[in-house]
């Protein structure tokens, strides 16, 4: 009953801008213009290097770092502040080989007018063969996003598709409110804040085991299980599938910005709304720290 009320209370809060009118899909931070705020000038070519740390990597409703801290290095090429191509290498604590998996990303964004923008992205997660049983199988994710600037809030509606051993669709709705301090250091730096709330929708599978009835979520890069690997004995029988709310999360990114670098810290609170005992994303706080430096 508590989960039921929480789901619809969260939905009401997140849909508030729609009521007033009737204020991303890689977990690796990437440089690039948030289309809710305008770049001061257009640069034809740009190149960035970056690195970051996180206490846990949650992606599409589940932990793909197996609840381990992670670190990463990244290089990103940008064209006209609209098209970005990046490659990231991720290290997980206590995992061999040292680089546990790689992420390739291609993103495009375009501002249509003062209140509407569109973007598209495709992401490839590649893991060494020796870790496919431990972590996940290789998969590709693509999404299309529309952004709406309501002045008080900035809203994103995203539709995405996962291509792996089991293809599936996702829907995300995110509200954020970007603001920044006056510039300092002779107009060369500022501190920005971008608090947000996000709803993730995806395929939920209700199953029966010998012990109980549970709701599982399809997880990226992991084929749906007929046997529960948590104890090795219970047989899982799927009874129904539905498209519903998988997760609610809230975050507060704080960034120090200059002309040539951005250093960002983020605290994120994750609230999963299903009870998969094997691959469930953890409930609670996650911390992330990243830095990007402009080479040219």
Model-predicted regions and their roles:
Residues 1-43, 277-280, 294-296:
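Cleavable N-terminal export/targeting peptides
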Residues 36-45, 112-117, 180-193, 257-261, ...:
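Short loop/turn motifs that connect adjacent beta-strands in outer-membrane beta-barrel proteins
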Residues 40-55, 81, 195:
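Transmembrane beta-strand segments of Gram-negative outer membrane beta-barrel proteins
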Residues 52-56, 88-92, 109, 121-127, ...:
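Outer-membrane beta-barrel pore domains and translocons
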Residues 56-71, 87-94, 239-241, 277:
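Surface-exposed strand-loop-strand hairpins of Gram-negative outer-membrane beta-barrel proteins
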Residues 57, 62, 119-174, 178, ...:
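Outer-membrane beta-barrel translocator/channel fold
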Residues 81-86, 114-118, 150-157, 182-185, ...:
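Repeated loop/turn-to-beta-strand initiation elements of outer-membrane beta-barrel proteins
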Residues 175, 281-296:
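Outer-membrane beta-barrel "beta-signal"
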